[in-house]
Amino acid sequence: MTIAVDRAARNSHSGFLEAGISLIAKRGIDNITVADISKASGFTRATFYSYFGDLDGLYAEIWMLYGRLWLEALAKDDLPYKSEADQLRCSAVLEIFIASKRKPAVLEVVTPTVSNWWNDSVSENKADQARLAWIVAGNIGIAISKHLAPSITNVKEIIALLRQMPSDPAVLEAMGLAPTPKTAPLQAVLRSLEVPEQTDEERIKTSTIEVVASAGVADASMTRIARNLQVTTGSVYPRFKNVSEIIGEAFNWGQKTIVEENTAAYATTNSNPDSYAAIIVGANSESRKVWRDFRLEMYLASRVRESLSKAMIPGLVEADTLLATFARKNRLPERHIDQIVGLMHALGLGFPALQNAGVDVQAIEHRIPTRYLVSVMNILKSSGVAASEFDHRIAARSVVPVIGNGDRSTTSAAS
Protein backbone atom coordinates (compact mmCIF):
# COMPACT_ATOMS: atom_id res chain seq x y z
CA MET A 1 0.00 0.00 0.00
CA THR A 2 2.80 2.42 0.95
CA ILE A 3 4.67 1.63 -2.27
CA ALA A 4 1.55 2.34 -4.34
CA VAL A 5 0.97 5.67 -2.58
CA ASP A 6 4.62 6.69 -3.06
CA ARG A 7 4.42 5.79 -6.75
CA ALA A 8 1.23 7.83 -7.16
CA ALA A 9 2.86 10.80 -5.41
CA ARG A 10 5.88 10.60 -7.72
CA ASN A 11 3.63 10.36 -10.74
CA SER A 12 1.55 13.36 -9.70
CA HIS A 13 4.63 15.45 -8.87
CA SER A 14 6.32 14.72 -12.21
CA GLY A 15 2.97 15.16 -13.95
CA PHE A 16 2.67 18.70 -12.62
CA LEU A 17 6.24 19.48 -13.68
CA GLU A 18 5.73 18.14 -17.21
CA ALA A 19 2.40 19.95 -17.60
CA GLY A 20 3.90 23.17 -16.25
CA ILE A 21 6.87 23.03 -18.62
CA SER A 22 4.63 22.39 -21.62
CA LEU A 23 2.18 25.19 -20.76
CA ILE A 24 4.89 27.76 -19.98
CA ALA A 25 6.60 27.01 -23.29
CA LYS A 26 3.42 27.10 -25.36
CA ARG A 27 1.40 29.87 -23.66
CA GLY A 28 4.02 31.94 -21.84
CA ILE A 29 4.69 32.20 -18.13
CA ASP A 30 2.12 34.97 -17.57
CA ASN A 31 -0.75 33.18 -19.29
CA ILE A 32 -1.29 30.04 -17.24
CA THR A 33 -3.15 29.20 -14.03
CA VAL A 34 -3.07 26.43 -11.45
CA ALA A 35 -6.37 25.20 -12.94
CA ASP A 36 -4.69 24.92 -16.37
CA ILE A 37 -1.85 22.85 -14.94
CA SER A 38 -4.22 20.69 -12.92
CA LYS A 39 -6.31 19.95 -15.99
CA ALA A 40 -3.30 19.21 -18.20
CA SER A 41 -1.69 16.92 -15.61
CA GLY A 42 -4.87 15.12 -14.56
CA PHE A 43 -4.27 15.79 -10.87
CA THR A 44 -6.15 18.03 -8.46
CA ARG A 45 -5.41 21.64 -7.55
CA ALA A 46 -5.26 20.63 -3.90
CA THR A 47 -2.42 18.25 -4.72
CA PHE A 48 -0.65 20.99 -6.68
CA TYR A 49 -0.82 23.39 -3.74
CA SER A 50 0.48 20.71 -1.38
CA TYR A 51 3.59 20.30 -3.55
CA PHE A 52 4.39 23.82 -4.73
CA GLY A 53 2.33 26.32 -2.74
CA ASP A 54 1.71 28.49 -5.80
CA LEU A 55 2.81 28.97 -9.41
CA ASP A 56 6.08 30.62 -8.38
CA GLY A 57 6.87 27.50 -6.36
CA LEU A 58 6.45 25.42 -9.51
CA TYR A 59 8.66 27.79 -11.51
CA ALA A 60 11.33 27.66 -8.82
CA GLU A 61 11.35 23.87 -8.84
CA ILE A 62 11.59 23.68 -12.64
CA TRP A 63 14.52 26.10 -12.50
CA MET A 64 16.28 24.06 -9.78
CA LEU A 65 15.95 20.95 -11.92
CA TYR A 66 17.11 22.40 -15.23
CA GLY A 67 18.58 25.90 -14.75
CA ARG A 68 22.22 24.93 -14.31
CA LEU A 69 22.09 22.46 -17.21
CA TRP A 70 20.58 25.18 -19.41
CA LEU A 71 23.31 27.69 -18.55
CA GLU A 72 26.01 25.13 -19.27
CA ALA A 73 24.39 24.28 -22.60
CA LEU A 74 24.29 27.98 -23.53
CA ALA A 75 28.00 28.26 -22.79
CA LYS A 76 28.73 25.30 -25.07
CA ASP A 77 26.37 26.37 -27.90
CA ASP A 78 24.72 23.04 -27.27
CA LEU A 79 21.07 23.64 -26.38
CA PRO A 80 19.28 20.29 -26.69
CA TYR A 81 16.70 21.07 -29.38
CA LYS A 82 16.59 17.60 -30.90
CA SER A 83 13.24 16.51 -29.46
CA GLU A 84 10.02 18.40 -28.79
CA ALA A 85 10.39 17.71 -25.07
CA ASP A 86 13.85 19.30 -25.08
CA GLN A 87 12.57 22.33 -26.98
CA LEU A 88 9.71 22.82 -24.52
CA ARG A 89 12.06 22.50 -21.56
CA CYS A 90 14.52 25.07 -22.95
CA SER A 91 11.71 27.51 -23.75
CA ALA A 92 10.18 27.12 -20.28
CA VAL A 93 13.51 27.63 -18.50
CA LEU A 94 14.19 30.72 -20.63
CA GLU A 95 10.80 32.18 -19.65
CA ILE A 96 11.43 31.49 -15.97
CA PHE A 97 14.91 33.03 -16.17
CA ILE A 98 13.70 36.26 -17.80
CA ALA A 99 10.60 36.67 -15.62
CA SER A 100 12.40 35.91 -12.35
CA LYS A 101 13.42 39.57 -11.94
CA ARG A 102 9.82 40.34 -10.88
CA LYS A 103 9.18 37.12 -8.98
CA PRO A 104 11.13 37.23 -5.68
CA ALA A 105 10.41 33.60 -4.77
CA VAL A 106 11.86 32.51 -8.12
CA LEU A 107 14.76 34.96 -8.16
CA GLU A 108 15.95 33.61 -4.81
CA VAL A 109 16.73 30.26 -6.48
CA VAL A 110 17.84 31.67 -9.84
CA THR A 111 20.50 33.98 -8.38
CA PRO A 112 22.48 31.34 -6.43
CA THR A 113 22.38 28.95 -9.38
CA VAL A 114 23.77 31.62 -11.69
CA SER A 115 26.38 32.67 -9.12
CA ASN A 116 27.60 29.10 -8.60
CA TRP A 117 27.69 28.43 -12.34
CA TRP A 118 29.61 31.65 -13.03
CA ASN A 119 32.14 31.09 -10.24
CA ASP A 120 32.70 27.48 -11.30
CA SER A 121 33.12 28.44 -14.96
CA VAL A 122 35.57 31.35 -14.87
CA SER A 123 38.95 32.16 -13.38
CA GLU A 124 40.55 35.53 -12.70
CA ASN A 125 41.47 35.69 -16.39
CA LYS A 126 39.64 38.71 -17.86
CA ALA A 127 39.51 37.22 -21.35
CA ASP A 128 37.91 34.01 -20.06
CA GLN A 129 35.28 36.03 -18.19
CA ALA A 130 34.52 38.19 -21.22
CA ARG A 131 34.33 35.22 -23.59
CA LEU A 132 31.87 33.34 -21.39
CA ALA A 133 29.72 36.42 -20.78
CA TRP A 134 29.54 37.33 -24.48
CA ILE A 135 28.80 33.77 -25.64
CA VAL A 136 26.08 33.13 -23.05
CA ALA A 137 24.55 36.61 -23.43
CA GLY A 138 24.55 36.20 -27.20
CA ASN A 139 22.84 32.83 -27.01
CA ILE A 140 20.23 34.13 -24.54
CA GLY A 141 19.52 37.01 -26.91
CA ILE A 142 19.16 34.64 -29.85
CA ALA A 143 16.82 32.34 -27.90
CA ILE A 144 14.49 35.13 -26.78
CA SER A 145 14.33 36.96 -30.12
CA LYS A 146 14.42 34.32 -32.86
CA HIS A 147 10.60 34.37 -33.14
CA LEU A 148 10.85 38.02 -34.25
CA ALA A 149 13.96 37.69 -36.39
CA PRO A 150 14.70 34.07 -37.39
CA SER A 151 17.85 35.23 -39.19
CA ILE A 152 19.38 36.20 -35.84
CA THR A 153 20.57 32.61 -35.57
CA ASN A 154 23.25 33.67 -38.10
CA VAL A 155 24.90 35.44 -35.15
CA LYS A 156 26.16 32.01 -34.12
CA GLU A 157 28.91 32.44 -36.73
CA ILE A 158 30.17 35.47 -34.79
CA ILE A 159 29.81 33.56 -31.52
CA ALA A 160 32.00 30.84 -33.04
CA LEU A 161 34.66 33.51 -33.63
CA LEU A 162 34.37 34.58 -29.99
CA ARG A 163 34.95 31.01 -28.93
CA GLN A 164 38.38 31.22 -30.60
CA MET A 165 39.34 34.39 -28.72
CA PRO A 166 42.67 33.70 -26.98
CA SER A 167 43.13 33.88 -23.21
CA ASP A 168 46.91 33.96 -22.98
CA PRO A 169 47.98 37.50 -21.97
CA ALA A 170 51.04 37.30 -24.22
CA VAL A 171 48.93 36.42 -27.26
CA LEU A 172 46.42 39.16 -26.42
CA GLU A 173 49.26 41.65 -26.11
CA ALA A 174 50.75 40.60 -29.45
CA MET A 175 47.38 41.06 -31.12
CA GLY A 176 46.89 44.47 -29.47
CA LEU A 177 43.87 43.18 -27.58
CA ALA A 178 44.99 43.49 -23.97
CA PRO A 179 44.02 46.77 -22.28
CA THR A 180 46.94 48.22 -20.35
CA PRO A 181 46.53 48.02 -16.56
CA LYS A 182 46.66 51.80 -16.21
CA THR A 183 43.57 52.39 -18.34
CA ALA A 184 40.22 51.83 -16.67
CA PRO A 185 37.23 50.85 -18.82
CA LEU A 186 35.22 53.78 -20.11
CA GLN A 187 31.51 54.08 -19.42
CA ALA A 188 29.36 56.00 -21.86
CA VAL A 189 26.96 58.32 -20.04
CA LEU A 190 23.55 57.34 -21.42
CA ARG A 191 20.28 59.00 -20.44
CA SER A 192 17.08 57.27 -19.48
CA LEU A 193 14.04 57.88 -21.67
CA GLU A 194 12.48 60.18 -19.08
CA VAL A 195 13.67 63.74 -19.73
CA PRO A 196 12.08 67.07 -18.67
CA GLU A 197 11.17 68.27 -22.16
CA GLN A 198 8.85 65.36 -23.05
CA THR A 199 5.53 65.89 -24.80
CA ASP A 200 2.34 64.48 -23.25
CA GLU A 201 2.44 61.49 -25.61
CA GLU A 202 6.07 60.80 -24.74
CA ARG A 203 5.22 60.96 -21.03
CA ILE A 204 2.48 58.38 -21.58
CA LYS A 205 4.88 56.14 -23.50
CA THR A 206 7.49 56.51 -20.76
CA SER A 207 4.89 55.56 -18.15
CA THR A 208 3.96 52.52 -20.24
CA ILE A 209 7.58 51.45 -20.37
CA GLU A 210 7.87 51.80 -16.58
CA VAL A 211 4.72 49.76 -15.92
CA VAL A 212 5.64 46.95 -18.31
CA ALA A 213 9.22 46.88 -16.98
CA SER A 214 8.02 46.28 -13.43
CA ALA A 215 4.92 44.15 -13.95
CA GLY A 216 5.15 42.55 -17.40
CA VAL A 217 2.94 42.99 -20.46
CA ALA A 218 0.09 40.83 -19.12
CA ASP A 219 -0.42 43.06 -16.07
CA ALA A 220 -0.18 46.39 -17.90
CA SER A 221 -3.41 48.37 -18.29
CA MET A 222 -4.52 51.87 -19.25
CA THR A 223 -5.54 52.43 -15.63
CA ARG A 224 -2.15 51.43 -14.31
CA ILE A 225 -0.32 53.53 -16.90
CA ALA A 226 -2.43 56.57 -15.99
CA ARG A 227 -1.99 55.96 -12.28
CA ASN A 228 1.78 55.79 -12.72
CA LEU A 229 1.55 59.23 -14.35
CA GLN A 230 -0.68 60.55 -11.55
CA VAL A 231 -3.45 61.38 -14.05
CA THR A 232 -6.90 59.99 -14.84
CA THR A 233 -7.45 57.28 -17.44
CA GLY A 234 -9.38 59.83 -19.49
CA SER A 235 -6.13 61.70 -20.05
CA VAL A 236 -4.67 58.67 -21.83
CA TYR A 237 -7.60 57.41 -23.95
CA PRO A 238 -7.90 60.38 -26.34
CA ARG A 239 -4.38 59.68 -27.57
CA PHE A 240 -4.40 55.86 -27.67
CA LYS A 241 -7.24 53.42 -28.37
CA ASN A 242 -6.17 50.64 -26.03
CA VAL A 243 -3.29 49.28 -24.01
CA SER A 244 -2.01 47.10 -26.87
CA GLU A 245 -1.62 50.13 -29.13
CA ILE A 246 0.23 52.16 -26.53
CA ILE A 247 2.59 49.29 -25.64
CA GLY A 248 3.53 48.78 -29.30
CA GLU A 249 4.06 52.50 -29.90
CA ALA A 250 6.07 52.84 -26.69
CA PHE A 251 8.40 50.07 -27.85
CA ASN A 252 8.97 51.54 -31.31
CA TRP A 253 9.52 55.06 -29.94
CA GLY A 254 11.86 53.83 -27.21
CA GLN A 255 13.83 51.56 -29.55
CA LYS A 256 14.52 54.39 -32.00
CA THR A 257 15.40 56.85 -29.23
CA ILE A 258 17.80 54.46 -27.52
CA VAL A 259 19.62 53.42 -30.71
CA GLU A 260 20.02 57.05 -31.79
CA GLU A 261 21.46 57.99 -28.40
CA ASN A 262 23.81 55.01 -28.34
CA THR A 263 25.22 55.75 -31.79
CA ALA A 264 25.57 59.44 -30.92
CA ALA A 265 27.40 58.52 -27.71
CA TYR A 266 29.78 56.34 -29.74
CA ALA A 267 30.64 59.34 -31.91
CA THR A 268 31.50 61.48 -28.86
CA THR A 269 34.11 58.95 -27.66
CA ASN A 270 37.27 57.88 -29.49
CA SER A 271 35.19 56.02 -32.10
CA ASN A 272 37.37 52.94 -31.80
CA PRO A 273 36.55 49.42 -30.57
CA ASP A 274 36.79 50.57 -26.96
CA SER A 275 33.93 52.97 -27.64
CA TYR A 276 31.52 50.08 -28.21
CA ALA A 277 32.73 48.52 -24.96
CA ALA A 278 31.95 51.83 -23.24
CA ILE A 279 28.43 51.76 -24.72
CA ILE A 280 27.88 48.24 -23.33
CA VAL A 281 28.93 49.37 -19.85
CA GLY A 282 26.76 52.49 -20.08
CA ALA A 283 23.77 50.58 -21.43
CA ASN A 284 23.88 48.33 -18.36
CA SER A 285 24.03 51.24 -15.91
CA GLU A 286 21.21 52.24 -13.56
CA SER A 287 19.95 54.95 -15.94
CA ARG A 288 18.93 52.29 -18.47
CA LYS A 289 17.51 49.66 -16.11
CA VAL A 290 13.85 50.45 -16.82
CA TRP A 291 14.42 50.31 -20.58
CA ARG A 292 16.36 47.05 -20.30
CA ASP A 293 13.62 45.39 -18.25
CA PHE A 294 10.89 46.71 -20.55
CA ARG A 295 12.65 45.34 -23.61
CA LEU A 296 13.06 41.91 -22.02
CA GLU A 297 9.37 41.86 -21.10
CA MET A 298 8.38 42.79 -24.65
CA TYR A 299 10.40 39.98 -26.19
CA LEU A 300 9.11 37.56 -23.56
CA ALA A 301 5.44 38.41 -24.18
CA SER A 302 5.75 38.63 -27.97
CA ARG A 303 6.96 35.03 -28.10
CA VAL A 304 3.34 33.90 -27.64
CA ARG A 305 1.47 37.04 -28.78
CA GLU A 306 1.51 37.39 -32.55
CA SER A 307 -0.19 40.80 -32.45
CA LEU A 308 2.54 42.15 -30.19
CA SER A 309 5.24 40.74 -32.46
CA LYS A 310 3.68 42.56 -35.42
CA ALA A 311 3.51 45.80 -33.44
CA MET A 312 7.22 45.57 -32.60
CA ILE A 313 8.44 44.95 -36.15
CA PRO A 314 8.51 48.62 -37.32
CA GLY A 315 10.74 49.64 -34.41
CA LEU A 316 13.07 46.71 -34.95
CA VAL A 317 13.35 47.37 -38.69
CA GLU A 318 14.19 51.02 -38.05
CA ALA A 319 16.72 50.08 -35.38
CA ASP A 320 18.35 47.57 -37.74
CA THR A 321 18.61 50.24 -40.43
CA LEU A 322 20.24 52.70 -38.02
CA LEU A 323 22.68 50.09 -36.74
CA ALA A 324 23.55 48.86 -40.23
CA THR A 325 24.27 52.45 -41.32
CA PHE A 326 26.45 52.84 -38.24
CA ALA A 327 28.35 49.63 -39.05
CA ARG A 328 28.90 50.69 -42.67
CA LYS A 329 30.22 54.09 -41.59
CA ASN A 330 32.80 52.19 -39.58
CA ARG A 331 33.69 50.17 -42.69
CA LEU A 332 32.92 46.78 -41.28
CA PRO A 333 32.70 43.99 -43.90
CA GLU A 334 29.43 44.21 -45.82
CA ARG A 335 28.84 40.47 -45.79
CA HIS A 336 28.87 40.47 -41.98
CA ILE A 337 26.74 43.59 -41.41
CA ASP A 338 23.56 41.65 -40.64
CA GLN A 339 25.43 39.39 -38.22
CA ILE A 340 27.00 42.37 -36.44
CA VAL A 341 23.62 44.08 -36.10
CA GLY A 342 22.15 40.81 -34.83
CA LEU A 343 24.94 40.50 -32.28
CA MET A 344 24.23 44.02 -30.99
CA HIS A 345 20.56 43.11 -30.51
CA ALA A 346 21.36 39.74 -28.92
CA LEU A 347 23.84 41.21 -26.43
CA GLY A 348 21.36 44.00 -25.68
CA LEU A 349 18.98 41.31 -24.39
CA GLY A 350 21.40 38.78 -22.97
CA PHE A 351 23.50 41.11 -20.83
CA PRO A 352 20.50 42.60 -18.98
CA ALA A 353 19.13 39.11 -18.33
CA LEU A 354 22.46 38.02 -16.83
CA GLN A 355 22.73 41.22 -14.82
CA ASN A 356 19.24 40.74 -13.36
CA ALA A 357 20.38 37.28 -12.22
CA GLY A 358 23.44 38.64 -10.42
CA VAL A 359 26.28 38.69 -12.97
CA ASP A 360 28.14 42.02 -12.79
CA VAL A 361 28.03 42.83 -16.49
CA GLN A 362 29.62 46.24 -15.99
CA ALA A 363 32.71 44.65 -14.43
CA ILE A 364 33.38 42.49 -17.51
CA GLU A 365 36.38 43.64 -19.56
CA HIS A 366 34.37 44.21 -22.74
CA ARG A 367 37.31 45.87 -24.47
CA ILE A 368 38.95 42.50 -25.12
CA PRO A 369 36.12 40.99 -27.24
CA THR A 370 35.35 44.29 -29.00
CA ARG A 371 39.01 44.69 -30.00
CA TYR A 372 39.20 41.04 -30.97
CA LEU A 373 36.10 41.10 -33.18
CA VAL A 374 37.13 44.31 -34.97
CA SER A 375 40.59 42.81 -35.54
CA VAL A 376 39.05 39.63 -36.93
CA MET A 377 36.64 41.60 -39.13
CA ASN A 378 39.53 43.54 -40.63
CA ILE A 379 41.34 40.26 -41.36
CA LEU A 380 38.24 38.75 -42.97
CA LYS A 381 37.73 41.89 -45.03
CA SER A 382 41.30 41.98 -46.36
CA SER A 383 41.80 38.24 -46.81
CA GLY A 384 38.43 37.18 -48.15
CA VAL A 385 38.40 34.30 -45.67
CA ALA A 386 34.94 33.26 -44.49
CA ALA A 387 34.20 33.62 -40.80
CA SER A 388 33.60 29.87 -40.58
CA GLU A 389 37.17 29.27 -41.84
CA PHE A 390 38.90 31.75 -39.55
CA ASP A 391 41.71 30.49 -37.31
CA HIS A 392 43.07 33.01 -34.82
CA ARG A 393 46.31 31.03 -34.40
CA ILE A 394 47.24 31.77 -38.01
CA ALA A 395 45.86 35.29 -38.00
CA ALA A 396 47.79 36.24 -34.85
CA ARG A 397 51.09 35.94 -36.73
CA SER A 398 50.31 38.82 -39.05
CA VAL A 399 47.58 40.85 -37.38
CA VAL A 400 47.95 44.61 -37.14
CA PRO A 401 47.20 45.67 -33.54
CA VAL A 402 43.76 47.17 -33.10
CA ILE A 403 44.94 49.56 -30.40
CA GLY A 404 48.43 51.01 -30.30
CA ASN A 405 50.61 52.41 -27.55
CA GLY A 406 48.76 54.51 -25.03
CA ASP A 407 45.50 52.92 -26.21
CA ARG A 408 45.30 55.16 -29.28
CA SER A 409 43.45 53.68 -32.20
CA THR A 410 45.72 52.47 -35.01
CA THR A 411 43.36 50.08 -36.73
CA SER A 412 39.82 50.81 -35.66
CA ALA A 413 36.35 49.97 -36.83
CA ALA A 414 36.61 52.99 -39.08
CA SER A 415 39.83 51.92 -40.79
PLM region spans:
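Basic, helix-initiating cap at the start of DNA-binding domains
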Residues: 1-27, 34-40, 57, 178-215, ...
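Amphipathic alpha-helical segments enriched in hydrophobic/aromatic and basic residues
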Residues: 24, 33-34, 55-66, 212-215, ...
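Short, structured motif recognition centered on aromatic/hydrophobic residues
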Residues: 29-32, 89-99, 136, 247, ...
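Short hydrophobic/aromatic patch on the recognition helix
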Residues: 41-52, 229-240
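Hydrophobic alpha-helical connector segments
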Residues: 61, 72-92, 262-292
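Amphipathic alpha-helical packing segments from all-alpha helical-bundle domains
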Residues: 102-130, 288-289, 293, 306-331, ...
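Hydrophobic/aromatic-rich alpha-helical bundle segments in the mid-to-C-terminal region
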Residues: 107, 124-185, 189-193, 309, ...
